[in-house]
Amino acid sequence: MMRELSNKRAIAAMPIAGSYRAIDFALSNMTNSRIQKVAVITQYNARSLNEHLSSSKWWDFGRKQGGLFVFTPTITAESSNWYRGTADSLYQNMQFLKQSHEPYVVIASGDGVYKLDYNKVLQYHIEKKADITVVVKNLEDRSEIGRYGVVAMTEEGRITDIDEKPLETNLSTVSTGIYVIRRRLLIELLEKAAEEDRHEFVRDILVRYKNIKKIYGYKLDTYWSNISTVDSYYRTNMDFLKKDVRDYFFKQYPDVYLSLIHISEPTRPERI
């Protein structure tokens, strides 16, 4: 796990390729996908993440109609409502979902390093008439496949089985922790999960409804890495020493943005 490195900062604020933070990749994807309203939900050590998010103009999004919102658990003298899982973190911020007007929601983990046009996932979601679309990735290296939710899919892309962190499996396609779902359906599923004292998005929504709802997998064929362990965090940073990886992220459209606070030289461009 990442406790050795993340005991003083959120994983989403961990440095990647020098100047970047892990969350920059997901937020850049959202900016490039023209998403106007973004909520960042964080549990522990939020200060460094908040400083990072507030320091860059690239995260302004659409302030008139949307904007960037950061939510942490509500801690009072009477109670401490720590998030008990991804579904619970969304449920505890239900008011944000209910006050929004957008028909669809993109849920994305802050510890993934990748490029993705979420509009393409949404288009796929609509074409398939899916209830939930999961962005999936085929792993060539299966040594750490037990860290992920492993999925079985039909040729048409429908997910027929989801095995969360299996000890053994012959499958190699995993969930990246990126989902597209209609907002009203998400609210309905979260409220149902809360009524039943269920808190995990994968186990208590995806697995629970895999045979009831139409869940499809959108295949991501480009670079993707998850930095939730020390080994994967090290390997991801080592990947950026490779020219093809650097060129893919920093020389090919769309851009990856970062905050000026992390640039050491004033003459260096803020958009790479």
What does each model-identified segment do?
Residues M1-W58, K64-G66, A77-S79, F96:
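N-terminal glycine-rich phosphate-binding loop and ensuing alpha1 helix
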Residues N7, A12, R21, L27-S33, ...:
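Catalytic cores of nucleotide-enabled group-transfer and carboxylate-activating enzymes in metabolic
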Residues A13, G67-V70, I215-G217:
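Conserved beta-strand scaffold positions in the cores of enzyme catalytic domains, especially
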Residues G18, P73-I75, K137, E164-L167, ...:
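Residues that form or immediately flank small-molecule/cofactor binding pockets and catalytic motifs
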Residues Q36-K37, D131, K214:
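Residues at the starts of beta-strands that form the adenosine-phosphate
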Residues F61-E155, V180, E188-K192:
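Conserved beta-loop-beta/alpha segment of the NTase-like Rossmann-fold superfamily
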Residues K98, E102, V106, V113, ...:
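Catalytic-core segments of class I nucleotidyltransferases/pyrophosphorylases
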Residues I261-I272:
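Single conserved hydrophobic/aromatic residue that forms the stacking wall/gate
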